[in-house]
Design a protein with these regions (language model features):
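A generic secondary-structure signal for well-formed alpha-helical elements
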Residues: 4, 8, 13, 37-48, ...
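A conserved FAD-binding loop/helix module that cradles the flavin
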Residues: 415-436
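A short acidic-Thr-Gly-centered motif at the start of a beta-strand
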Residues: 130-136, 168-173, 384, 390-400
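Glycine-rich loop(s) and the adjacent beta-strand/alpha-helix scaffold that form part
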Residues: 137, 146, 150-154, 162-236, ...
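Alpha-helix N-cap/helix-initiation motif
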Residues: 22, 123, 169-172, 177, ...
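FAD cofactor-binding and catalytic pocket of flavoenzymes
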Residues: 1-21, 26-31, 36, 85, ...
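Conserved redox-cofactor binding core of oxidoreductases
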Residues: 14-148, 371-375
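A glycine-rich dinucleotide-binding beta-alpha-beta segment and adjacent secondary-structure elements
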Residues: 90-95, 106-114, 149-154, 158, ...
Length: 446
């Protein structure tokens, strides 16, 4: 549950233009978003201790919950090693209850965490916080198992609602005075592109061909350290990741941006296979022997590299392939920007340094490679900006072409930081929601 750094909102001003990139500053700043970061941390629930992180932006309050205890063996190995290197390690912020909070119990620290449902409901998200609270008000209705076909508009260019397939695959219409699109970076772009009409033949917000472009994700690079002794990598203290450093998010010589580094989440044996030494046979007795040798003798350090946006990295509608409902599926195109590869390889080398200092016998880097952009944490396809010619939504998330349609998710990110963007998505949602409510109450959206 990371806040972006102040520098992440002004990448173009800090680093200048990058060839073949659409790198730009956000139209808002960290200071604009700080109150909503705090709101997200307290309303959703974040644990940890980020006080030692000297690189973070100003904050008015500490996190609402302390870091999780007890500490794992990896923490005991990695934290002093980072300090010896002159880094500034600290406990990760998590959307997990370290103590009972908001009527739900604390984390049990089991290893089956990432990718699994929480047995104690201690993992925090909208599903067990703001959505249930909204339903209790009886002022909203939650429709599940539905698929939106298009945002409908009238002859004046004003949205009138959405057409959608219900849980029984029947096409229905939901009238609305305000439409908020929050489908994620690929699907929000897809929905706007599918919402074609006489006034908007290329889709909503796409008058200048920006919908779907600037697709970004996070390339995770790092290193695996193999230790002579049993480092209790899997000591059943979940979720695994516990210590991080932000020393390489910015100020890397010759590079724009960077990313956070931390140890990995607990990996089940089937997940660990990809982290065996590269010369390990992929099957047979030798493979089993390597699993026994390395499974509890390794530590992984990696992190999300900030991707450099590019015009050709994009979401489009596939001209041929249709889904179950006959709608065009998403087609992704555009490779990872070369500068992102350089950033990723720099991060991998720094992770290797950390592991060697921690006492690893040998280390293998997991370096960046070319390929399709938009890996984990997709963002950027409905860029926020003040100029309708170079963005899709304004600084308040309103689609430039349609004054009662808002896009509120990671697709509005101008850049995607060197962190998991979930807290930024939540903070932006609180900010946008407040603005929409104020506009409605003032009569501006009626």
């Amino acid at each position: 549950a990371w806040r972006f750094m102040p520098q992440d909102f002004r990448m173009r001003s800090l680093y200048g233009a990058i060839e073949d990139s659409t790198l730009e500053d956000w139209p808002i700043t960290y200071d604009d978003l700080e109150p909503y970061y705090e709101q997200a941390e307290y309303e959703i629930g974040v644990s940890g201790d980020v006080t030692p992180n000297i690189f973070q932006g100003p904050r008015k309050k500490p996190l609402p919950m302390p870091p999780m205890v007890p500490k794992s063996r990896e923490y005991e190995i990695l934290k002093p090693a980072a300090e010896r290197l002159g880094l500034h390690p600290f406990d990760l912020p998590f959307l997990i209850n370290s103590v009972p909070y908001n009527g739900r119990s604390a984390c049990m620290r089991i290893r089956w965490c990432v990718g699994f449902a929480c047995e104690t409901d201690a993992k925090n998200g909208t599903h067990n916080t703001v959505i249930p609270r909204a339903l209790v008000t009886r002022n909203c209705l939650l429709r599940t198992e539905c698929v939106v076909k298009e945002v409908m508009v009238d002859d004046r260019g004003k949205a009138t609602g959405v057409a959608f397939f219900d849980e029984n695959d029947r096409l229905q219409e939901q009238p609305a005075d305000i439409v908020v699109v929050s489908c994620g970076a690929t699907e929000s772009a897809r929905l706007l592109l599918m919402s074609k009409s006489k006034l908007f033949p290329e889709g909503l917000g796409n008058r200048h061909d920006w919908v779907g472009r600037n697709l970004q994700g996070h390339s995770y690079t790092g290193a695996i350290g193999y230790f002579p002794e049993d480092v209790d990598t899997y000591d059943d203290i979940g979720p695994g990741a516990c210590v991080a450093a932000c020393d390489y998010n910015h100020d890397n010589p010759g590079l724009a941006g960077g990313g956070m580094l931390c140890n990995e989440f607990i990996r089940l044996p089937i997940q660990f296979i990809g982290n065996l030494p590269r010369d390990t046979p992929r099957w047979g007795l030798a493979h089993k022997a390597a699993m026994r040798r390395y499974y509890q003798h390794n530590i992984g350090v990696k992190g999300p590299t900030q991707e450099i946006p590019a015009w050709d990295a994009r979401v489009q509608l596939d001209p041929v392939v249709r889904d179950y409902w006959g709608l065009p599926v998403v087609r992704l195109s555009g490779g990872i920007h070369p500068h992102t590869l350089d950033l990723g390889n720099h991060q991998a080398a720094r992770a290797a340094d950390w592991l060697r200092e921690a006492g690893a016998d040998f280390v293998e880097e997991r370096r960046a490679g070319p390929g399709l952009t938009g890996h984990q944490h997709q963002a950027g396809t409905c860029r926020m900006g003040s100029d309708p010619k170079t963005s899709v939504v304004d600084p308040w998330h309103r689609v430039h072409d349609v004054d009662n349609v808002f896009v509120v998710d990671a697709s509005v990110h101008v850049t995607n930081g060197g962190f998991n963007p979930v807290l930024t998505i939540m903070a932006l949602a609180f900010r946008a929601g407040e603005h929409i409510a104020q506009e409605w109450q003032g009569g501006g959206l009626r």
